[in-house]
């Protein structure tokens, strides 16, 4: 939680199992030190490859907040029901064909992020593009690609897993893998 005007870090909440205590300690220290939420991306935190990634979830939260501070356009769960279905916007799902076939939001066209550059001509210029993926990473990458081609693109905050869990009252407590990819 951060103050909108100053980005001063005010609080944090984490849900999970392993490593939650470490990350809350880091965030509590950052709050005590008066860090801005955008400073979290620059923290140099120790890690061991078998237990964490090179960029800790605390760093990733900082990157997300930094993107917001720089004007990354997002859309949220409460916007989903209000998205125009009249063709005035493009609705894009960047997950794999397999992920899309297991469930998707009506009206969303499936172009996997790895095919986006080759299939960019399938997206009508001049229309805003609302993008979703499984967890948020691929849709973020897709919005950056689309912006590079001159599109006005909006990234869904949360991903289809979040959307599906809320809309269909499903539990999110399960083993998750990166970007919905099976290991």
Which residues make up each language-model segment?
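Rhodanese-like catalytic fold shared by cysteine-dependent sulfurtransferases
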Residues: 38-89, 97-128, 134-183
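C-terminal catalytic lobe of FAD-dependent flavoproteins
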Residues: 1-40
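Short hydrophobic-acidic sequence motifs that mark active-site Asp/Glu residues
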Residues: 9-11, 91, 110
């Amino acid at each position: 939680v951060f103050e909108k005007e100053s980005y001063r870090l005010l609080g944090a909440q984490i849900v999970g199992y392993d490593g939650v205590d470490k990350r809350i300690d880091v965030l509590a220290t950052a709050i005590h030190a008066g860090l801005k939420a955008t400073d979290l991306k620059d923290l140099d935190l120790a890690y061991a490859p078998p237990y964490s990634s090179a960029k800790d979830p605390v760093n990733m939260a900082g990157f997300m907040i930094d993107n917001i501070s720089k004007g990354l356009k997002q859309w949220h769960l409460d916007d989903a029901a209000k998205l125009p279905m009249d063709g005035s916007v493009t609705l894009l799902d960047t997950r794999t064909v397999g992920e899309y076939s297991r469930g998707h939001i009506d009206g969303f066209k499936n172009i996997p992020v790895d095919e986006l550059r080759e299939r960019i001509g399938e997206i009508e210029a001049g229309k805003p593009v609302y993008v979703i993926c499984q967890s948020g990473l691929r849709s973020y990458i897709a919005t950056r690609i689309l912006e590079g081609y001159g599109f006005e693109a909006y990234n869904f905050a949360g991903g289809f897993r979040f959307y599906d869990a809320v809309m269909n009252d499903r539990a999110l407590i399960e083993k998750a893998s990166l970007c919905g990819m099976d290991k």
